[in-house]
Amino acid sequence: AISDHVMYQLKEMNPLFSKVIFISNSQLSEKYVSVLFSKDLIQEFIQRENIGYDFAAWKAGLELEGLDNLEKYDSVTVMNDTCFGPLWDIVGYYEKYENDPEIDFWGMTNHAEVKGHNLYIPEHLQSYFISFKKRLATSNVFRKFWESVVAHTDVQKVIDEYETQYTKIFMKAGFAYTAVLDTVPIHQDYFHRNFTIHYPQVLLDYKVPFIKIKTFDLSQHLSPYTLKTIEEKSSYPIDLIDSHMTSVSIPTPAYLLDRKVIEPSNKIVSVDKKVAVHLHTFYVDLLP
């Protein structure tokens, strides 16, 4: 199946692109693929084995189109389905960055450099959303990078060899990038470097149009605020978040419980079947 938030994302972003290649690393039935085509949400579909994660999938998409054919496009965007969004109209972001002659590739957030005793992570544009402009997409360094991508089975290898490295490779070749939220100037004021997981409120303050799905479970203490802010300050259908997190987070996390309260009804219902209720109460003093 295709999650509703993915369908929404495709619908909202489709007008931006002259061609959309949808790549699935999990098996999709013909029924769902047909829906994508019938609604004109995609132009090409790739069903592939679940190896290599997003970078190998993007490579497959680029190979299908042909790296030599990228010349006919103004830009090439790669993204995955690890986010909810767009929270706000995405057109303005494209107009801003695509029309900036100083920028060759851009995305939502970056990760500041980390220098530790046994750890080094270079500054990099986080890869859940990247848009490459023509000058970079038609370059030799772009071709060489994607030709080097291997379908690793270990996600950490994908992170170490591709996600954290591609920014440095392209910058070394003379290309410049930017992010909607540039964390480099502000990261010293925060304990964690990965803002997408730990500081969703900062992403919302900077109007980053995508919010990572896993931030809701990994930063549950912030999730009520995150949901409330999205509901009040964006037009994003909040039920897409509620329903998806309910289906992937079992048991239902505490931050969703107040959204599942059933309104009292005076309607009398007659049921001829026995109903068992299992109520687990940790604090018995909370019982009436």
What are these regions (language model features)?
Residues 1-288:
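ER/Golgi luminal nucleotide-sugar-dependent glycosyltransferases, focusing on the catalytic module
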